[in-house]
Amino acid sequence: MLALESPLVKLKKLFEIFNFSFFFIAFIYLFLSIFTSFQAFKINEFYSELNPDINGIQFEEINFKNKFSTSLNGWWVEGESDNAFIILHGLRSNIGEKFYIDLISEFNNLGFSILAFDFRNHGKSGEGKFSFGVEEVYDVDASIKYIRENKNIENIFIWGFSFGATTGLNYSIYNTKGSDVSGIIADTPYYDPIEVLIDEVSKRTPLNSYLSKLLKPGIIISSKVFFDNDLENIKNIFESETINNTPSLIFGCKNDTTVPNSHPRRIKKKLGAMSKYVEFENCSKHGDSFIYNNEEYIYEISNFLNEQFEIKNK
């Protein structure tokens, strides 16, 4: 006859199972938090060698430095007016991609000069701290100073996509006087990079949305520990009491799963009366709005620009 286990032995086994489960879950939690942080701060080294010449656009290779002496590589395209656009590319991208070159052509056809440059850690530019658009505002500031000091330009507008859009808007919020730029066009900016990262975890792992959200504290802490970066900074900037004085046109994509339309909608709400929100339905993924809605996209931009010129001339 088998001897029955004593309550003490059973309790010991339960304790061992509990310990194993706890440490296993903790290990998985730490692994996913750290892995997500490292993936978030990993910049793709891919560089496209295309330039505006493929569209028959003449350009000048330029180089300037931000306040940290980081070398920033770019192009200058001369326009017919004294107005200019600064092109701010997306994350893990560079100005040599055809998407941006086609935009340069569109803006140049409107008579604008264009300064397009690679952010730090991207393309041919130098290395620097990556912060999802917080410290990158100094790259934007350097591009504006380059134009003011070297070109005969009166009105400067910013067009940015995703990471570039959020960075451009952050610059306008920092710049409380609103005098450096005449307007910002932000194509699918993100409101909170942590949300974007958590959504990616739920799409790429067996974890559902609820379980992925539990990783938020771990991702925030590991980003601070390993990269000296507070991922809540972007959201805090948008939720600050700073009043935005720069007119902004914000684009969203109804079917965007990378940066869902809830992000640009919240940004529009934050920026208030100085902003306008346009949402495109004919887009299947992040960055499709310009490609599949070209005429409407440029039409909205032209109207926005004309409104700013009319206000200025009153």
At which residue positions do the language-model features occur?
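The serine-hydrolase catalytic nucleophile loop
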Residues: 93-105
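Short alpha-helix in the alpha/beta-hydrolase fold that links the catalytic acid
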Residues: 260-269
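Catalytic nucleophile-loop/oxyanion-hole region of alpha/beta-hydrolase
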Residues: 95-96, 120-151
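Short beta-strand/loop motif that positions the catalytic acidic residue
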Residues: 243-244, 249-252, 256
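Hydrolase active-site cap/lid region
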Residues: 173-230
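Conserved alpha/beta-hydrolase
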Residues: 104-126
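Catalytic histidine-centered segment of alpha/beta-hydrolase-like enzymes
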Residues: 283-295
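An N-terminal hydrophobic leader/cap segment in hydrolases
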Residues: 14-65, 75
